[in-house]
From Swiss-Prot:
CDD domains: F-box_AtFBW1-like (cd22157). PANTHER family: BNACNNG10540D PROTEIN, F-BOX DOMAIN-CONTAINING PROTEIN. Keywords: Kelch repeat, Repeat. Gene3D superfamilies: 1.20.1280.50, Kelch-type beta propeller. InterPro entries: F-box-like_dom_sf, F-box_dom, Kelch-typ_b-propeller, KIB1-4_b-propeller, SCF_F-box_component. PROSITE patterns: FBOX. Kelch repeats lie at residues 201-245, 298-339, 342-390. This is F-box/kelch-repeat protein At5g15710. Residues 19-79 are annotated as: Disordered.
Amino acid sequence: MERLGFWGLLMGSVEKSLDSGNSLACSASAKNGDEESSTSSKQVSPLKGSGSRNTSPLGRVGSRNTSPSRQKVVKTKPRGLEEETVASFGKQVVADVQMEDGIWAMLPEDLLNEILARVPPFMIFRIRSVCKKWNLILQDNSFLKFHSNVSSHGPCLLTFWKNSPQIPQCSVFSLPLKTWYKIPFTFLPPWAFWLVGSSGGLVCFSGLDGLTFRTLVCNPLMQSWRTLPSMHYNQQRQLIMVVDRSDKSFKVIATSDIYGDKSLPTEVYDSKTDKWSLHQIMPAVNLCSSKMAYCDSRLYLETLSPLGLMMYRLDSGQWEHIPAKFPRSLLDGYLVAGTQKRLFLVGRIGLYSTLQSMRIWELDHTKVSWVEISRMPPKYFRALLRLSAERFECFGQDNLICFTSWNQGKGLLYNVDKKIWSWISGCALQSCNSQVCFYEPRFDASVL
C-alpha cells in the first residue's frame, strides 16, 4: 500500500502537470535582460522529463508574469533535497487519479526500476521516503543499470561555498527544470575548500589538511566520497578531473601552478590503479592563467612566453607548444572546452571601459589561429560588468558557456550552437565566495 500511495501521488502529479502546464520558479528574475532570452525564473515541474518542451505561455522562455495578483508564492521544504521555492497559479485543480489496487500493487520489480530510472534525479530523494525498500533504491543494481542506460538529465550548475563557521553549502541549478535545489554537503571533511571541477557525475575538491595538500572525489547525489592517495610531491597544484563512463573510471591530472614550482613533473591519478604516476615536466613557460581546458584527451593552458598554448596529451604523457597567438588587445582570457575537439577562448577586448567588449573565439586546429565566432551584446556586458576593473569567471561544458562576476547575484549563460544569451538568478549565486562549475547529476558515478 505504501507503493500504491506513491503511485497515486506520482500519477496524479503528472496528470496535473499535463492539464495545467508547468509552474514557474520564484528565483529572482533579472530585469535588464530582454524577454527573448531570459530564463532566470522559469521552472519546469520536477516530474517532467529532462529536455521536455514547455508549451505553457506562462512558462515559455522569454515570457514574464508581471502581474503580482496572478502568482501565489508558496514556501516548501520537500524531503531530502530542499527546493528553494515553488510558484503556483490559480488554475483548475484536477482530482487525484484513482489507482486500481489489482494493477499497481503487482507491478513487476524490473518495470518499477525502469520507471524510477526515468524520474528526474532530484525527485528520487522524495521517493526514498515512501518505504524502507525504496530508501535503498540507490544501492539496487537493477535500478542503477536502468539509470545508466537512460539519457542524461541535462546540464546543471553546481555552486559551493562555506558559511560561518565554515559549514559547507551546495545548491544545484537544473537547466532543464529551471529550478534550484539544495544538496546536503556536510559529509565533506573540513579541509575540502577548493572546488576543482566536475565530470560524469563526480565532483573533485582539494585543500590543505594541515600542511598536506589533499584531493578528494565525491558523488553529491549518493553522498559518497573518498580521499585520493597523496601525490609524490606535496605541493599545491593545478588539478582537473576527467571521467571515462565506458569503463567507469576517472583520472585527475596535476600540473604546475602559475605561482608554484615549475620544475615538478606532471602527475596523473588513475582510479583503476589507485595510484599517481609521474610524467614529463612541463617545458619552461610563463603561464598567464591558472585556468585549464580539457577536450579530446588533451589538456590546454595559456602561456605568455612563448606566446600560445601548452597542450598535454593524456595518452602519451607528453607536452607540446601550440603557437596560436592571442587576439590583439586581449585583456583577460579563459579557455573553455566544447564538444568533440572544439576549444574556445573567451575574453575582454579593449583598453578603456567605454571600448571594452566580451568576445568568443574558436581555435582553428588546421591554421593554428583563433577565429571570432560571437560577441556579447553590449547590454549584457554592461549588466555583467558594471565597472571596467571588475573580475569575472567563465567556464563551460557541451558548448554552453557561463559567466559570473564577483558583484552580481546572477550568471549569464550562452549557448554556442543556438547563439542565445540568458540570465540565471538565484540565492546560490549571491554569495561572494561561491565557486561554480557545470555538473551532471548521476547515481551510477562511483568514487571507487
